């Protein structure tokens, strides 16, 4: 699934960037990235009607169902918006590390690594979500990711 591969790339690039600042930070970032996916399954996926199906745009539906039971009848939009912040550090800690590295220890390698992280995290993943994974999703009208303007007003 393209979404999972791009997320894996984001996590590895992010761990590389943070590890260049301080090796233990890179290791911690990698562990956090993996734990955040499990937390995503527990806090968000259990409330989704795609849990246990292959129709999940993220590709987590079947995998998350192996570890967590669904909670039917939940307000998916509210749950998603409340808990999605667990994923923010996966994007913004490596981004901050990349900016720091560019300012403190600029090199072409750091620039290329940072550029790859930015392209994957802020262009590729949103593009895959909007135009491939989420395009035909039956929960699109309930999902804050796909209906961000309306969802912000409703929550």
Name each region found by the language model:
Residues 106-148:
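Alpha-helical transmembrane segments and their immediate juxtamembrane interface regions
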Residues 56-82:
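Short membrane-interface loop/juxtamembrane segments of multi-pass integral membrane proteins
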Residues 1-36, 87-119:
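Long, highly hydrophobic alpha-helical transmembrane signal-anchor segments
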Residues 53-63, 142-150:
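Membrane-cytosol interface motif
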Residues 23-51, 120-129:
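Hydrophobic alpha-helical membrane-embedded segments
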Residues 155:
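Polar-ligand-bearing catalytic/cofactor-coordination segments
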Residues 45-51, 56, 134-137, 143:
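Short cysteine clusters
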């Amino acid at each position: 699934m393209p979404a999972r591969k791009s997320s894996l790339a984001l996590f590895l690039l992010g761990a590389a960037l943070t590890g260049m600042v301080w090796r233990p930070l890179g290791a911690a970032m990698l562990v956090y990235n993996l734990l955040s996916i499990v937390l995503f399954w527990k806090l968000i996926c259990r409330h989704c009607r795609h849990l246990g199906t292959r129709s999940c745009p993220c590709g987590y539906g079947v995998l998350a169902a192996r570890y967590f039971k669904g909670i039917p009848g939940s307000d998916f939009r509210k749950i998603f918006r409340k808990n999605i912040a667990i994923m923010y550090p996966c994007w913004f800690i490596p981004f901050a590390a990349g900016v720091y590295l560019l300012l403190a220890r600029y090199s072409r390698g750091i620039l290329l690594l940072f550029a790859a992280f930015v392209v994957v995290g802020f262009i590729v993943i949103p593009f895959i979500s909007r135009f491939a994974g989420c395009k035909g999703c039956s929960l699109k009208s309930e999902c804050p990711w796909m209906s961000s303007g309306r969802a912000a007003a409703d929550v």
